[in-house]
Amino acid sequence: MIVYQDLLSGDELLSDSFPYKELYNGVLWEVEGKWVVQGAVDVDIGANPSAEGGDEEGVKIRLVKVVDIVDTFRLQEQPPFDKKQFLGFIKRYIKNLATKLSEERQAEFKKNVEGAAKMLVSKLSDLQFFVGESMHDDGSMVFAYYKDGATDPTFLYFADGLKEVKC
């Protein structure tokens, strides 16, 4: 199994269990999330309920709907950004990330990241923002939105901000 960690914070953000599609010459990865139902069962094996006057069966099921990617990697949702805040984050993130890339990759990244950033700005009001479990200030941001008519979210990752780790 391959896990993709945030290059800047080390948080696990994705794995090869979730196929991705490259956008903007590989600058962004698009990953389809799914709503899943998780449940916990509580079984009361205590005293005889009829003797205590209770009619309960002793089994309680609690179901919770979660998004698989958010739950699996313990992503933490962040408050929405306005355009000024978002542009400030993107500039800082690109600057921090570029220092971690090879010179050759830096040039390619800088050439293609502008289109990706413009697309994100155009969807800003539709985006949900997530960070890794550590909530590191300078770490990667994971973006989620719903495509037209979709019931499951689509996630966007900066590919160069991910480090491949084999487990």
Swiss-Prot record:
It comes from the Eukaryota. The keyword Cytoplasm applies. It holds the Pfam family TCTP. InterPro entries: Mss4-like_sf, Mss4/transl-control_tumour, TCTP, Translation_control_tumour_CS, Translational_control_tumour_p. Its main location: cytoplasm. Residues 1-167 form the TCTP domain. The keyword Calcium applies. PROSITE patterns: TCTP_1, TCTP_2, TCTP_3. It is found in: Cytoplasm. Keywords: Calcium, Cytoplasm. Involved in calcium binding and microtubule stabilization. Belongs to the TCTP family. PANTHER family: TRANSLATIONALLY CONTROLLED TUMOR PROTEIN-RELATED, TRANSLATIONALLY-CONTROLLED TUMOR PROTEIN. This is Translationally-controlled tumor protein homolog. It comes from Pseudotsuga menziesii.
